[in-house]
């Protein structure tokens, strides 16, 4: 089963693709958000290319599990995706994914690798691989 993961943001959306056979994911180029509008063409292209069985969207919660301002935006984004693509859209806890993404990128590639787009897509990888582990249980 092919799954696309999206790390929702108001300026960039991190993207990763993976499959549940190996429970691994790889990052893809992030999608820019302009004037709070999603680039549907780029997302359509991704869906056409990868033909995912589902999309996992990062669900941003506070450390204590409560919702924050961007949580509702992510939930609304997920609803839009469900209406557009007619495939399962699954929210998955993304707490600390950005912190982990920065640590991985810094360790592998150094300080210069810490660009926002790269961090967002690495966060999407972390979200998807976490979802694979969660969905096994």
From Swiss-Prot:
**Does the keyword field hold Nuclease?**
yes
* Transmembrane intervals: none
Q: Which enzyme class, named as a word? A: hydrolase
* InterPro entries (UniProt xref): RNaseH-like_sf (IPR012337), YqgF (IPR005227), YqgF/RNaseH-like_dom (IPR006641), YqgF/RNaseH-like_dom_sf (IPR037027)
Q: Which cysteine pairs are joined by S-S bonds?
A: none
Gene Ontology MF terms in the entry: nuclease activity
Q: Where in the cell is it found?
A: Cytoplasm
What do the Gene Ontology cellular component annotations say?
cytosol
Q: What is its main location?
A: cytoplasm
The Gene Ontology biological process annotation of the record reads: rRNA 5'-end processing
Alphabetical keyword list = Cytoplasm, Hydrolase, Nuclease, Ribosome biogenesis
Return the SUPFAM superfamilies for the record: Ribonuclease H-like
Query: What's its EC?
Result: 3.1.-.-
**SMART domains reported for this sequence:** YqgFc (SM00732)
Functionally, this protein is described as follows: Could be a nuclease involved in processing of the 5'-end of pre-16S rRNA.
Query: What family does this chain come from, according to its entry?
Result: Belongs to the YqgF nuclease family.
What is the name of the protein in this document? Answer: Putative pre-16S rRNA nuclease
Gene name, per UniProt, is yqgF
